[in-house]
Amino acid sequence: MDKKLSIAIDGPAAAGKSTVAKIVAEKKSYVYIDTGAMYRAITYTALKQNADLTDEAALTELLKRTEIELVSVPEGQIVLVNGEDVTEEIRKDEVSNQVSIAAKHKGVREEMVKRQQQLGQKGGVVMDGRDIGTHVLPDAEVKIFLLASVEERAKRRYEENKKKGYDVNYETLIEEIARRDKLDSEREVSPLRKAEDAIEIDTTSLSIAEVAGKILEIVEQKSR
């Protein structure tokens, strides 16, 4: 029987992490943990309560009082905040554009990492984010770092948003993704960076199926 591995998939905004991670988890019958959704959930909660996203102490305290659940359903995964389904709300631009502000706080990240490590401790998980291979699951057997050009990532996000009926502008998305890259890469706590033992995959000219296929091949090799 194949050994149950921990799979860490990192990369910048809109590199295809979540989509690929879901496919890999489904093919392997592993649990998928979308850490980005957890940061989006606290950002959404703070915005809803008119909390100051730059106030680290207040945001950390709010997070400690907030229950965030990732629930598997036949269609994928739903995100609950204190029992309320916020799956759609957390994907809106208002949250996307401000999640990096909430995610840069040390107190917030420490609490999130603690929760994520508890979720991933038994193996058999696929976890995606910015600091999974470097910080959350540093001992993961499989570490992947996905890359894609800013233009390609903006194009993907544009098409994704159009499908959902959101009003979007391609040039604005390029600016927003570049700004998020800068915030994620330059933050003091757990910045976006590739783990030394991660395998890098440039997804710019690859389909989602091709990227998932490459990762599954790596997983098969490590499972033996």
Curated annotation (Swiss-Prot):
MF GO annotations: ATP binding; CMP kinase activity; dCMP kinase activity
UniProt EC number: 2.7.4.25
Entry keywords, A to Z: ATP-binding, Cytoplasm, Kinase, Nucleotide-binding, Transferase
Gene Ontology CC terms, in alphabetical order: cytosol
UniProt record, GO biological process: nucleobase-containing small molecule interconversion; pyrimidine nucleotide metabolic process
CDD domains linked: CMPK
Domain of life from the UniProt record: Bacteria
Compartments (UniProt record): Cytoplasm
Major location category of this protein: cytoplasm
Pfam families tied to this protein: Cytidylate_kin
UniProt xrefs under SUPFAM superfamilies: P-loop containing nucleoside triphosphate hydrolases (SSF52540)
Binding site for ATP: G11, P12, A13, A14, A15, G16, K17, S18, T19
Reaction(s) this enzyme catalyzes, per UniProt: CMP + ATP = CDP + ADP; dCMP + ATP = dCDP + ADP
EC category name: transferase
NCBIfam families for this protein: cmk
UniProt record similarity statement: Belongs to the cytidylate kinase family. Type 1 subfamily.
Stated name of the protein: Cytidylate kinase
Organism: Bacillus velezensis (strain DSM 23117 / BGSC 10A6 / LMG 26770 / FZB42)
Classification of source organism: Bacteria, Bacillati, Bacillota, Bacilli, Bacillales
